[in-house]
């Protein structure tokens, strides 16, 4: 049977043996095949695989994980970073710094996931470079960079992202929004909403906001209702239909109808009715 099927399957004897062999033998080819399946596996399956890999990592084989870094996957970056940190601590920090400085974008993204687990003082000198990689067009590298900067409370990056909101270039404004959302800058919401109301990218901006503020909180204000109106309007042309599930929209609509009906929410509900009746 195909090893990927065994690793993702339900037979403990099979998936435990494959996971152990994967790490013990540093099977780069098998890991590369696993990463290529990312778009075809359900999230719960990938979570199962990550947990299976996690259970077989130990003090004797954790360094083998370094051989997997050319094949990036957001599904497995945490388990790899945690394995390296849990068994290598800061002793392997020099190796990860070298990978971050000189590696390809995939390796840099993994290194940053590791950096997100260690105290600021150990990577202080790398912060200027991390601010640069936060602007990378390789999204995992950007996201993982901003995660580190957020955990380090890096006010320089946050300030630069806020400045982008004042740009006359709407692409720059939108990038600023994405950076602030990834940074978890909740206090920037008023500025983000102000940009959204004026921007021709209002629907794109709206789609980012639920990753900063829960939809259940957004419905408590008229500005939040406007965010949801923009999101509904953008489905499916700009925002994929899966957003209905991601944002738990039907439950939100039901709550509005039963408990929080207002003139603003009535507009949203009417818009949703017309959109999803199509």
Predicted regions located by residue number:
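N-terminal "cap/leader" segments of large eukaryotic alpha-helical scaffolds
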Residues: 1-19
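Core helices of alpha-solenoid repeat scaffolds
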Residues: 28-31, 62, 92-93, 123-127, ...
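Short alpha-helical hairpin
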Residues: 1, 24-27
């Amino acid at each position: 049977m195909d090893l990927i099927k065994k690793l993702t399957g339900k037979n403990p004897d099979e998936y435990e043996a494959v996971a152990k062999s994967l790490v013990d033998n540093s099977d780069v080819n098998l890991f590369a095949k696993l990463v290529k399946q990312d778009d075809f596996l359900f999230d719960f399956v990938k979570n199962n695989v990550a947990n299976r890999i996690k259970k077989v990592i130990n003090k004797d084989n954790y360094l083998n994980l370094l051989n997997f870094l050319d094949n990036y996957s957001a599904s497995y970056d945490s388990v790899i970073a945690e394995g390296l940190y849990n068994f290598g601590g800061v002793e392997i920090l020099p190796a990860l710094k070298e990978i971050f400085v000189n590696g390809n974008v995939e390796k840099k993204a993994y290194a940053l996931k590791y950096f997100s687990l260690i105290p600021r003082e150990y990577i202080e000198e790398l912060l200027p470079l991390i601010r640069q990689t936060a602007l990378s067009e390789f999204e995992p590298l950007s996201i993982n960079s901003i995660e580190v900067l957020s955990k380090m409370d890096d006010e320089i990056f946050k300030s630069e992202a806020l400045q982008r909101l004042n740009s006359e270039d709407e692409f720059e404004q939108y990038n600023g929004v994405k950076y602030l959302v990834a940074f978890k800058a909740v206090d920037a919401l008023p500025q983000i909403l102000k940009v959204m109301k004026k921007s021709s990218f209002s629907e794109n901006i709206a789609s980012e906001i639920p990753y900063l503020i829960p939809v259940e909180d957004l419905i408590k204000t008229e500005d939040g209702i406007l965010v949801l109106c923009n999101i509904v309007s953008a489905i499916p042309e700009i925002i994929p239909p899966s957003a209905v599930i991601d944002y738990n929209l039907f439950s939100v609509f039901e709550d509005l109808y039963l408990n929080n009906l207002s003139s603003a929410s009535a507009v949203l509900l009417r818009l949703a009715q017309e959109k999803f009746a199509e």
